[in-house]
């Protein structure tokens, strides 16, 4: 049976459903739903002789066999009925409506991929534009019900998104991400494989690495977007809304290329691992993100997470406080005076961290460092952003174990230190950037 030949049996099934519903005095709600969610509703339709004819035709469609699997034929047949009555306000068969339903079914059948789309509220976020395409299926939109509806977010998702939009940091923008996977019988019921949330998380990570501000996302709501719902109901959600106090993040449009590079680098490192970077780059990234996302928010844990990120990148097993302070100051500072100031500052932050993790009560000096915790996180941002770009760039290399064994030897030599800072993109007071070099570090340490 071809797809065109299939319409007549479907029309006969719908007429049989109408006749039976009218005879039994059922209302329209009994004819709407999602297949396999209500066995009583399903049995009402499946008991009709016309149902078996349509199901048999579904099984014979080559695309159904290849993409959905013949075991889903009953579900799809039920959903054709439910979807039809979801589009009408009367218990009757409208030929024009049936044609539209059929066209949508065939269109979806011709599409070889499942499209998943997620939406989440952006928090502590400012942007003058109403739309920014970030690439890789990720985009920012101003909060607008019509725009959301055009993206497939209405009804339950819209209600949950509105309910989630509250408290400190609520903004007028949302983040949308989508991904696709090839249709196969083994992923027929998969609403989300995690890729949508991962793209949202990666986008936020890139934003945080290029500019200051407490930008974050709320719960991410994910659904399958399709011309025809093949019988998958419900909305999948992941993550949680963390209300934090902080200053807003203003989208730095002038650094769009840096965002693109950072996003691509994060994606690359997720695929290949983080071994090329200094220390434990994966842990450093997670600790840095925790300074934004940890709940309940507390300034002392924000400081501890920031120091953890520094230790993961540049820590050592002995003389930790001094060596960590020396390395951070040497990499970030561009003059002797700046190095001295940064060394003292990082040492003070580290001492404050030690007081906290050992259960001590902060004194006056420690409270001053706690009040300046955002300065510490800015240091982490510059280093981490630089190391992420470096670790993902195959044209920039250092000898094996360089960061573990030879870093300090380079940092005490002014010429080699500046060469290293240029290689890492740290030779400016601006956020990390990809340097214009393809050199190796070998010449710096021999």
State what each model feature region is.
Residues 320-334, 396-408:
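Short alpha-helical "patches" and their helix-cap loops
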Residues 308-312, 355, 382:
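Residue-level signal for well-ordered alpha-helical scaffold segments within enzymatic catalytic domains
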Residues 315-318, 354-362, 385-393:
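Charged/polar positions within long, soluble alpha-helices
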Residues 1-68, 96-100, 253-332, 340-348:
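Amphipathic alpha-helical interface elements
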Residues 340-368:
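Histidine-centered, metal-coordinating catalytic motifs and their short helical/loop contexts
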Residues 306, 322-327, 362, 366-376:
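Composition- and surface-driven signal marking solvent-exposed, interaction-prone regions
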Residues 15, 53-301, 369-370, 378, ...:
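Charged, non-catalytic interaction/linker regions at domain boundaries
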């Amino acid at each position: 049976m071809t797809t065109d030949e299939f319409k007549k049996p479907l029309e006969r099934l719908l007429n049989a459903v109408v006749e039976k519903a009218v005879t039994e005095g059922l209302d329209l709600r009994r004819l709407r739903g999602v297949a396999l969610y209500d066995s009583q509703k399903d049995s009402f339709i499946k008991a009709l002789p016309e149902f078996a004819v349509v199901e048999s035709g579904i099984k014979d469609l080559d695309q159904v066999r290849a993409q959905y699997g013949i075991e889903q034929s009953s579900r799809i047949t039920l959903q054709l009925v439910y979807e039809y009555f979801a589009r009408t306000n009367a218990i009757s068969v409208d030929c024009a409506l049936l044609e539209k339903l059929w066209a949508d079914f065939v269109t979806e059948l011709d599409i070889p991929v499942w499209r998943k789309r997620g939406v989440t509220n952006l928090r502590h976020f400012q942007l003058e534009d109403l739309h920014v395409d970030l690439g890789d299926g990720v985009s920012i939109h101003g909060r607008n019900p019509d725009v959301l509806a055009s993206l497939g977010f209405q009804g339950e998702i819209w209600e949950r998104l509105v309910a989630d939009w509250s408290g400190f940091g609520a903004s007028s923008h949302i983040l949308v991400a989508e991904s696709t996977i090839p249709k196969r019988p083994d992923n027929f019921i998969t609403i989300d494989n995690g890729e949508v949330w991962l793209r949202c998380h990666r986008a936020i990570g890139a934003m945080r690495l290029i500019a200051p501000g407490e930008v974050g996302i709320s719960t991410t709501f994910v659904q399958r977007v399709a011309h025809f719902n093949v019988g998958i109901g419900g909305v999948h959600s992941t993550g949680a809304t963390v209300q934090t106090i902080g200053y807003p993040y203003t989208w730095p449009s002038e650094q769009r290329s840096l965002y693109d590079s950072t996003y691509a680098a994060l994606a690359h490192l997720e695929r290949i691992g983080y071994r090329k970077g200094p220390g434990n780059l994966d842990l450093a990234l997670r600790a840095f993100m925790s300074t934004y996302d940890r709940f309940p928010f507390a300034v002392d844990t924000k400081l501890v997470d920031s120091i953890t990120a520094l230790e993961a990148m540049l820590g050592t097993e002995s003389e930790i406080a001094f060596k960590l302070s020396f390395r951070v100051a040497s990499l970030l500072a561009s003059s002797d005076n700046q190095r001295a100031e940064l060394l003292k500052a990082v040492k003070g932050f580290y001492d404050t961290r030690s007081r906290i993790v050992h259960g001590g009560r902060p004194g006056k000096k420690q409270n001053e460092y706690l009040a300046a915790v955002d300065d510490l996180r800015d240091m982490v941002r510059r280093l981490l952003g630089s190391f992420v770009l470096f670790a993902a760039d195959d044209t920039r290399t250092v000898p094996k174990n360089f960061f573990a064994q030879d870093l300090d030897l380079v940092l005490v030599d002014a010429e080699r230190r500046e060469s290293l800072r240029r290689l890492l993109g740290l030779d400016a007071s601006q956020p990390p950037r990809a340097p214009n070099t393809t050199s190796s570090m070998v010449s710096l340490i021999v």
